[in-house]
Swiss-Prot record:
Pfam families: HGTP_anticodon, tRNA-synt_2b. This is Proline--tRNA ligase. One of its GO terms (biological process) is prolyl-tRNA aminoacylation. Catalyzes the attachment of proline to tRNA(Pro) in a two-step reaction: proline is first activated by ATP to form Pro-AMP and then transferred to the acceptor end of tRNA(Pro). Belongs to the class-II aminoacyl-tRNA synthetase family. ProS type 2 subfamily. It comes from Paracoccus denitrificans (strain Pd 1222). GO terms for cellular component: cytosol. The gene is proS.
């Protein structure tokens, strides 16, 4: 993409309304525009990152054997009355009447609707296990929306639901989701720690929240520092292997890690003092096992092996897709701007032309741009007639992991400069070598999607 033709309304000054880093940088980089309290338009740069995150979510859900679908944003209030949850959400739930005076609501979650779909079409235990998910916009009428996309009223969320014949099968689904989420977050360049949590209005016998450590986090967290040394890495997982999924869950949850809601001071004190940590965290996902909480009142049953009807065991699993952008920025930035991890960056590399209008630099940039594209690399080419300092400032603000700088002095020796946004280190090499090096850097990102 040529920057001269791109819509990226960058701001020079910090917006006064932004209280935290991610909100400030997303506004300054032209990623979002506020339309109402807690409601945002996603401008091209922000939308591009949002879609990269969503794509990783879809890939990892497919890898775990989960099936994508799409449910509407508006739901019938009758389903929520049937489950007994219609009043639980209070004023957070946006209630609507259509022209026929029927009660509708803008869904904050989808347990009722997915249970209704299941009971309408699944009748036998032979159709189990089943896990369905979708990625859809949600609305919760927060009393005090703030912090940009971190605590908005409208947000994009992946929510999935498993249906199993027995508690044992449902707990395997729980473990499978925990493993899948660990891999999902790591691909995004995040370390999201699974922590024992409270079920809230969704309920559940077992639940873990995934939190990213950040000073601006809304939750106080208590954990054993050894957990931050754990990495999912490139391990291969057979999601049908009960023992393997259970082993990964135990590896990542056996050490103490809890939110303030479930914190046990006595247990925490048993950890060696040098390993005790108290910090703040941003919730980016949560998984639940809630047994027959919804299936029993809503009649979601199947014919079991003995011919009798039994309620299915269920769980739900959510990832805050739009919130993840804020969490990534909170975890990865400096005083000049965003530092995107390679897995979610809107563009793989930026090209800066130091002498726009010069035949040699223009030609070299065009050739470099074409070759990067041929190698499957998405480049943002700053071809504007601007000062070099302004171009560097824009690239630093936007936070692409790599920058190629092209100038007449370097080209005289067939050299360009490849710079890491994270470390600031620069290396001179030929344009061809820069393309090869970038392809090597991004190959693990491409491989992870396979």
């Amino acid at each position: 993409m040529r920057l001269s033709r791109y819509f990226m309304p960058v701001l020079k000054e910090d917006p006064k309304e932004a209280q935290i880093v991610s909100h400030r940088l997303m506004l300054r980089a032209g990623m979002i525009k506020q339309q109402a309290a807690g409601i945002y338009s996603w401008l091209p740069l922000g939308y591009k990152v949002l879609r990269r995150i969503e794509q990783i979510v879809h890939e990892e859900q497919a890898r775990a054997g989960h099936i994508a679908m799409l449910m509407p944003t508006l739901q019938s209030a009758d389903l929520w009355r049937e489950s007994g949850r219609y009043d639980d959400y209070g004023e957070e739930m946006l209630r609507i009447k259509d022209r026929h005076k029927r009660d509708l609501l803008y869904g904050p979650t989808n347990e009722e609707m997915i249970t209704d779909i299941f009971r309408s079409h699944v009748n036998s235990y032979k159709d189990l296990p089943l896990t369905l998910y979708h990625v859809q916009w949600k609305f919760r009428d927060e009393i005090r929306p703030r912090f940009g996309v971190m605590r908005g009223r409208e947000f994009l969320m992946k929510d999935g639901y498993n249906f199993d014949l027995t508690k044992e099968d449902a707990l395997h689904a729980y473990n499978r989701h925990l493993v899948s989420y660990l891999r999902t977050y790591e691909r995004m360049g995040l370390q999201a720690i699974p922590m024992r949590a409270d079920g809230g209005p969704i309920g559940g016998d077992y639940t873990h929240e995934f939190l990213v450590l950040a000073e601006t986090g809304e939750s106080e967290v208590f954990y054993d520092s050894e957990i931050t040394d754990l990495k999912f890495g490139d391990r291969r997982i057979d999601y049908d292997d009960v023992a393997q999924c259970r082993a990964v869950l135990e590896e990542f949850t056996s050490r103490y890690a809890r939110t303030d809601e479930t914190h046990d001071a006595a247990l925490f004190e048993q950890i060696p003092k040098e390993r005790r940590r108290v910090a703040r965290g941003i919730e980016v996902g949560q998984i639940f096992y809630f047994g027959t909480k919804y299936s029993e009142p809503m009649g979601a049953t199947v014919v079991g092996p003995d011919g009798s009807r039994v309620p299915v065991h269920m769980g739900s699993h959510g990832i805050g897709v739009s919130r993840l952008l804020g969490a990534i920025i909170e975890a990865s930035h400096d005083d000049r701007g965003i530092i995107w991890p390679e897995g979610v960056t809107p563009f793989h590399v930026g090209i800066v032309n130091l002498k726009q209008g010069d035949a040699s630099t223009d030609g070299a940039c065009e050739a470099l741009y074409a070759e990067l594209k041929a190698q499957g690399l998405d480049a943002l080419y700053d071809d504007r007639d601007e000062r070099a300092g302004a171009k560097f400032a824009t690239m630093d603000l936007v936070g692409l992991p790599w920058r190629i700088t092209v100038g007449p002095r370097g080209l005289a020796a067939n050299k360009v400069e490849l710079t890491s946004r994270r470390t600031g280190e620069s290396v001179e090499m030929s344009p061809q070598e820069a393309v090869v090096r970038l392809r090597e850097i991004y190959q693990p990102v491409f491989d992870a999607a396979k």
